């Protein structure tokens, strides 16, 4: 189960990064959207090596700023189990 959760979180990070890059939004700009001053916060999340991940408030802010639904950033559970 823990392995599936890690994969699920990895997929969320990947979806957010894909949407960020598609919109030419830098890590700094995304960090500022999330209320942080440094791009290091987003870099830590995107590398998934520091046990930091997006929370629901982050996903709401990202979806709002990107003009998409929160559900666009969340993978289907069945996809995460493969």
Task: Report residues per predicted region.
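Short, charged recognition helix plus adjacent turn
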Residues: 1-6, 64, 72-82
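A short, Lys/Arg-rich alpha-helix, primarily the initiator
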Residues: 1-23
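Residues that mark the N-terminal boundary/hinge immediately upstream of a DNA-recognition element
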Residues: 15, 26, 55-58, 69
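Conserved hydrophobic/aromatic packing and binding residues within compact polymer-binding modules
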Residues: 16, 27-31, 42-45, 73
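The alpha-helix within a helix-turn-helix
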Residues: 20, 31, 63
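Residue-level detection of the helix-turn-helix DNA-binding "recognition helix"
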Residues: 21, 35, 47, 78
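Short, basic-rich loop-to-helix N-cap that marks the start of a DNA-contacting helix
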Residues: 24, 48-64
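Recognition helix of helix-turn-helix/homeodomain-like DNA-binding domains
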Residues: 36-52
